[in-house]
Amino acid sequence: MKLTCVVIVAVLFLTVWTFATADDSGNGLEKLFSNAHHEMKNPEASKLNERCLDAGEVCDIFFPTCCGYCILLFCA
């Protein structure tokens, strides 16, 4: 019985601690939904429209956009 109470208190404390130390807990969902709304109005802004490069195409080492891996400037 005592162990159960201690566990409940610990979980409640950790939950409160998580919400109290969150960086942007008040505006997080609002920003998420406004970005999603912007992407619906402007489909080009969506990251899902970016095409990955097939094997054998030239890729960039620093910003690879390959479907697989970027090895020696070519997608694998």
UniProtKB/Swiss-Prot annotation:
One example GO MF annotation: toxin activity
Gene Ontology CC: extracellular region; host cell presynaptic membrane
Disulphide connectivity of cysteines: C52-C67, C59-C70, C66-C75
Keyword Glycoprotein: no
Comment text on domains: The presence of a 'disulfide through disulfide knot' structurally defines this protein as a knottin.
Its job: Omega-conotoxins act at presynaptic membranes, they bind and block voltage-gated calcium channels (Cav).
Protein name: Omega-conotoxin-like TxO1
Organism (species): Conus textile (Cloth-of-gold cone)
Taxonomic classification: Eukaryota, Metazoa, Spiralia, Lophotrochozoa, Mollusca
